[in-house]
Amino acid sequence: MGYLIAFIILLILFVLLITIVPVVMVVYLKKKQLKLTFVPKSQTSFKKIVQKTKDLEEECEDLNNKNNELKKAISDQNLQIDLLKKNNENFLLNATSLTAEQAKKELFNLLKIKFKKELAQEYAKIKHEFNEAQEIYAQNILVETMEQIAEPLIVERSLFNIDIIDENLKGKIIGRDGRNKAVFENEGGVDLIVDRQQPIVGISTPNPIRREIARIVMQKLIDSKNIDINRIELLFKEEREKFEKKVFEIGKNVVEQTLGFFDLPEGIYSYIGRMKFRNSYGQNILSHSLEVAEYAERIAKLINIDPIKAKKAAFFHDIGKTIDFESDLDHVEAGLLIAKKFNLDDYIYNAIESHHNKVIPTTIYGALVKIVDTLSAARPGARVNSYDEYYSRVKELETICMRFEGVKSAYVIKSGRQLRVIVDSNLVSDEQLELLGHEIKVAIEENDLLTNYKIKIVLIKEKRISIDTNIIG
């Protein structure tokens, strides 16, 4: 009986085993299979997961790189600390055998390594303070120099007046039908202004050399009271010859007495003398050059460079203006030509060329001349732009006329409103005279500098015949 019960129990257990266990196994395997084969339902979701995975991998790589950099930085710092410790140890070990100077040097090197950044910052600060101090010092030098040389300003004009006490002389100056006046204007290249209401005679021209010669001639005519055509022509001829001697003496006096130079060739004296009769922007060139030379000399002494060289370079910087209006060169090119003609020093060449930025200053004197030239020209009222513009137009008009064959001379008078052209009667016939006037008119109208100005052109052709008779004693 007991065996039967046991058998029944075993049978029940066997049935349960063969029915339940397979079911459990199937369920388990299905669940396992679902986990292993799970994929997103859509392709877009799958791509997002892949991209997210890549992003996470990149972030992980960046973190690893930063971690490596930090490790390297820490390693470098540790090496520097070890080096400092070692240097300290070596310094302490060697301190007993070092002299005071050696110990000082070792300590300085040690501190320099340790405080390298702080030293760089301190250097930058000191440099900034030094530059500010330099700028203030330079300003003080310029202000002090200008205060010491502040001179009364004289601006040259194109009109010179001569007093006439005897009113009867005015009639003689004008002459019958205005002949004396016309000859004076033609010979002198000036505009003669005779006002019946005023006790003066005015001589007007932007060319200071012509004005000076005409002034001397007029003064001699007034003093002698002997005024006729022949005497006017003779005096102009004489004064032109004397003028070259006069400018030589002026130049010599300026060089030796005013400037104190005794090592210049005498040939350059005439050019220096002509500076007295040349203006630029209404400013007299000789006065300007002397002023600039004095500026340069004073500043040179303050900054410890050769004051004589500075003075020479500054004085000659505008020497070209004595001939630029007689040639096609600008005043820098003309100045360099004069300087080389008389073998002046190289630093003077550089000062002439660089003061208007033709070249870069290659000497301290060239740089100094640029500064002092600006100082002199920048003084309030020192220059008058309209004057120089007027002079440029006059020069251009006269230059155009002189290019034509048969023209003896050309002068601008009547304050720039009239161009008087004197022709050679042997070269220009009466028929050619009108054609010449037309050609001059066209040339003026084609010039951009002169297009906005109305100018009257007067051509003068005069033929004189002089016959001497036998003197009967």
UniProtKB/Swiss-Prot annotation:
Keyword Endoplasmic reticulum: no
Annotated SUPFAM superfamilies: Eukaryotic type KH-domain (KH-domain type I) (SSF54791), HD-domain/PDEase-like (SSF109604)
Gene Ontology terms, MF aspect: RNA binding; RNA endonuclease activity
GO BP term, example: mRNA catabolic process
Record-linked PROSITE patterns: HD
Residue ranges constituting the KH domain according to the UniProt record: 158-218
Subcellular location: Cell membrane
GO cellular component, one term: plasma membrane
Stretches assigned to coiled coil: none
Location of the HD domain: 285-378
Topology within the bilayer: Single-pass membrane protein
Transmembrane segments: 4-24
SMART domains the UniProt entry points to: HDc
Family matches, as CDD domains: HDc, KH-I_RNaseY
Pfam families assigned to the protein according to its UniProt record, in alphabetical order: HD
UniProt keywords, alphabetically: Cell membrane, Endonuclease, Hydrolase, Membrane, Nuclease, RNA-binding, Transmembrane, Transmembrane helix
Record EC number: 3.1.-.-
Family assignment from sequence similarity: Belongs to the RNase Y family.
Biological role: Endoribonuclease that initiates mRNA decay.
Protein name: Ribonuclease Y
Source species of the chain: Ureaplasma parvum serovar 3 (strain ATCC 700970)
Lineage start: Bacteria, Bacillati, Mycoplasmatota, Mycoplasmoidales, Mycoplasmoidaceae
Gene: rny
